[in-house]
Amino acid sequence: MDPIILAEINGNIATVGYGLAAIGPGIGVGIVAGKTVEAMARQPEMAGSLRTTMFLGIAFSEALALIGLATYFIFTN
């Protein structure tokens, strides 16, 4: 095949791969935030501690998306 076509296919595959890699953290952040709100509704006095733990969970989940973004840039070049 033509090298230009192969480069285009490789770039498109990397784009789809990053999109798939971003789905997991998006779902994870939604679950973490939802469960934190449920826990705060049950025990309002623990809201500060729960909020801190929620932000840590979101940060770890978003780290996976950043790894996917780095992988995208590695495979497109």
UniProtKB/Swiss-Prot annotation:
Record site feature (Reversibly protonated during proton transport), residues: E62
Key words, A-Z: ATP synthesis, Cell membrane, CF(0), Hydrogen ion transport, Ion transport, Lipid-binding, Membrane, Transmembrane, Transmembrane helix, Transport
Location, primary (coarse class): membrane
Disulfide pairings: none
Localization in the cell: Cell membrane
Any single GO CC term annotated in Swiss-Prot or TrEMBL for this entry: proton-transporting ATP synthase complex
Xref: InterPro entries: ATP_synth_csu_bac/chlpt, ATP_synth_F0_csu, ATP_synth_F0_csu_DDCD_BS, ATP_synth_F0_csu_sf, ATPase_proteolipid_c-like_dom, F/V-ATP_Csub_sf
Positions of transmembrane segments: 13-33, 55-75
Molecular function GO labels: lipid binding; proton-transporting ATP synthase activity, rotational mechanism
Gene3D superfamilies given in the database record: F1F0 ATP synthase subunit C
Subunit structure: F-type ATPases have 2 components, F(1) - the catalytic core - and F(0) - the membrane proton channel. F(1) has five subunits: alpha(3), beta(3), gamma(1), delta(1), epsilon(1). F(0) has three main subunits: a(1), b(2) and c(10-14). The alpha and beta chains form an alternating ring which encloses part of the gamma chain. F(1) is attached to F(0) by a central stalk formed by the gamma and epsilon chains, while a peripheral stalk is formed by the delta and b chains.
Matches recorded under HAMAP family: ATP_synth_c_bact
Its biological purpose: F(1)F(0) ATP synthase produces ATP from ADP in the presence of a proton or sodium gradient. F-type ATPases consist of two structural domains, F(1) containing the extramembraneous catalytic core and F(0) containing the membrane proton channel, linked together by a central stalk and a peripheral stalk. During catalysis, ATP synthesis in the catalytic domain of F(1) is coupled via a rotary mechanism of the central stalk subunits to proton translocation. Key component of the F(0) channel; it plays a direct role in translocation across the membrane. A homomeric c-ring of between 10-14 subunits forms the central stalk rotor element with the F(1) delta and epsilon subunits.
Designated name of the protein: ATP synthase subunit c
Source species: Clavibacter michiganensis subsp. michiganensis (strain NCPPB 382)
Gene this chain is encoded by: atpE
